[in-house]
């Protein structure tokens, strides 16, 4: 893993954690296992340093690599996110819940349809990423943007599931996802734009406030 690449990833994590995010997903699944494990450990350290004294410590999850997430668990990694090319979510969840993962180990699943969302709910996933909600070049393989109306439908269909909106989410439309019923949002480019850090901080604070209002309402 090139040092420059590692430094940029950790800098992006610092910015996101400073903005007040609850979760950071390590997406470099193509790294060799040892390098990915080391990156996850460093991410945990960054999160702890940047949120010192703050009870809302950002939690770290690893994309796809259940083996690395479990190996890094002792160092503070909190879970794994399973995409469409990952292990079967039901199999992974049953195996982890059989005493093979730490208590509280989160397992999230990417979903792109109502059927997939209900399947994840039946498997007792901790949360789902659902989308793409908006147009985005990074999600073209999953079809056209599905929009806020469909997002709201998904949230109503799986009321006991935390639904995280993904796909084209930015500073302008993030709040509308929460208003549609999502528990949170996931984004990449928004948190990589260091030129708008104050705006991002405001967006994250707004999402936290809206989420609190949704729960209390």
Q: What residue spans do the PLM features occupy?
A:
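Conserved N-terminal beta1-alpha1 strand-loop-helix module at the mouth
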Residues: 1-88, 93-126, 146-149, 153-163, ...
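A short acidic, helix-capping loop that chelates divalent metal ions and anchors anionic groups
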Residues: 26, 134-140
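Flexible, Lys/Arg-rich cytosolic regulatory linkers and terminal tails that connect or flank
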Residues: 130-131
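Glycine-rich ATP-lid loops
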Residues: 143
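C-terminal binding/interaction regions
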Residues: 185
